[in-house]
Amino acid sequence: MSWKLDKQFSDKICNFSHDFFNKKLIKKGKPISGEWTVLATLVLVVENTSSYEIKQVLSLGTGNRCLGKSSLSNQGDVLNDSHAEIICKRSFQKFCYNEILNLLQSKYYNSILFNIEYHDSNNNNKDNDNNGSLPTISIKKGHSLHFYVNQTPCGDCSIFPFKKETQPENFIEKEKLEKDGKDKIENHEKKEQKDIIKQVDKDKDEENYEDEESKRKLKKVKDDNNNNNNNNNNNNNNNNNNNNNNNNNNNNNNNNNNNNNINNNNNQYDDIQRTGAKTVFGEPEDKKLIGVDYHQIGVLRVKPGRGDPTVSMSCSDKIARWNVLGIQGSLLSHFIKEQIFLSSITIGDLFNHSSIYRGLIGRLLPNPTTTTTETSSSSSSSSSSSNTIPNFKLNSDLEIFSTNIQFQFSKLLLESDQQNNNKSTSSGLAISFCYPNQHEVTIAINGKKMGTNQKNFNAISQRSSICKFNLFKLFHQLVLIIKNKNSNEENEKNNQIVLIDSLFNYYECKHLSKKYYQEYEKLKEFKFKNWLTNSSDLENFVLDN
């Protein structure tokens, strides 16, 4: 049976991910009592004509914080975004580099995911890696990648309506609690900035550090518990029907119906699930009115910050971009034949099928359905023409699944525990893992390895293995091996690898991936015009020659 037809597939992916976290990862970096975090995994599934097997967790990430603009580095030596989804994606990229290196170094190496083929400078296929042969990497037939995250990604996916009558607290009191929490954070900001290095040395002090998003959503998640469990059950049924029919039109109808419910039948709903992610410049701003009109939907957002604003796009926006550009990124696109797309995404807490479909797929379609003036203007602000068919490849076949199985360190589970009378906080650490056994813990508030202090902050040894600089080093290792295998004079005249080998500038090497950036420019032109990009000053770092 295909995984698409298995009604228990999402629960199997969830359990496989949880078991891996609990049994295969060491304790280092995991939340302590009273702490919560977000978990994301990328799982390999291998399918044949009659069955499938959930094979391996290829990468994993935990975390829910990111750096403010003033904390970014122009050396590529810190992790800017430590949300679990992004840690998982960067860990997967590290896995890709390692696998390709192994394939290049040994013709006997059997990759768990990739095939390697060789061709000459005229793109003619060759049987082996003799001189003059260039490698092309592709995913093995029947192999697919499946993303799991234990709660809805921040940003557009997490905005959906609900009925106030299902909530255990008075709405006005809840709003007051949210405001009080935000004020307390702002009052303590200066003190915490001074103590930042001291805090990272002691795990127990991490509970005193919490960003605006964490504080705000603790109240909201607790309120939305009952309502969203109902949403999960309903949407599980919808998803199973969609899978059995394998019909994307059902997804479109679900998304359109949800938009109509929000905007045309406001009496059905009292409020909207809120996100701390802020709209980017150029997008319509949130109206912040009472009830369902608080947020705009379908717009680009940045992750919330604490006084120091961030320039990291929301996870909803980043995953949507993966549905066009792939999860391999620009540098790996030099070697990998086609974009690497996710086949499915399974989400736990705060699941709402329509909002997730809208955030990841619907708003990228040629004519996304909008039913209010404000939402329509949002769509046009991110699109040069809503009637123009985007000339880019969209992963519209992405399957969206839900699961009611909760992660043991989820915020929703922690807040619903009636025996927990202590204040809950988000973990200040982020775990990254990539297959087969590379495990690392970083400090989310400074983007460096666990154990970093004031004295060793700038030490090379304290850089994360998945920071830009270190992934760039892996990229150049690939380039050097390919160049050495491709040393005849004719190929050196025509080979872009030789050109790349002469460049040690991160920004320049990224932008040499012409196919990737052609797709990226199309995406910006037609849909994501206001996407925030890093200043070139932050990406002009170089490797030692």
UniProtKB/Swiss-Prot annotation:
Question: Which residues fall in a compositionally biased region of kind Basic and acidic residues?
Answer: 171-205
Q: Which cofactor does the UniProt annotation name?
A: 1D-myo-inositol hexakisphosphate
Give the E.C. number(s): 3.5.4.34
InterPro entries hit by this protein: A_deamin
Binding of 1D-myo-inositol hexakisphosphate occurs at: 89-90, 318, 321, 468, 510
Extent of the signal sequence = none
**Origin: domain of life:** Eukaryota
Q: Where is the composition biased (Low complexity)?
A: 226-267, 369-386
- Name any Gene Ontology BP term: tRNA modification
- Which stretches make up the A to I editase domain? 59-541
Q: Which keywords has UniProt assigned to this entry?
A: Hydrolase, Metal-binding, tRNA processing, Zinc
UniProt region (Disordered), positions on chain: 171-270, 368-388
The record's active-site residues are: 85 (proton donor)
- Disulphide bonds in the chain: none
Single Gene Ontology MF annotation: RNA binding
Is-annotated flag, keyword Phosphoprotein?
no
**Entry's cofactor comment:** Binds 1 myo-inositol hexakisphosphate (IP6) per subunit.
Q: Which residues bind Zn(2+)?
A: 83, 154, 315
Q: Which family does it belong to?
A: Belongs to the ADAT1 family.
Tell me the protein's name: tRNA-specific adenosine deaminase 1
Q: What is the lineage of its organism?
A: Eukaryota, Amoebozoa, Evosea, Eumycetozoa, Dictyostelia
Its gene?
adat1
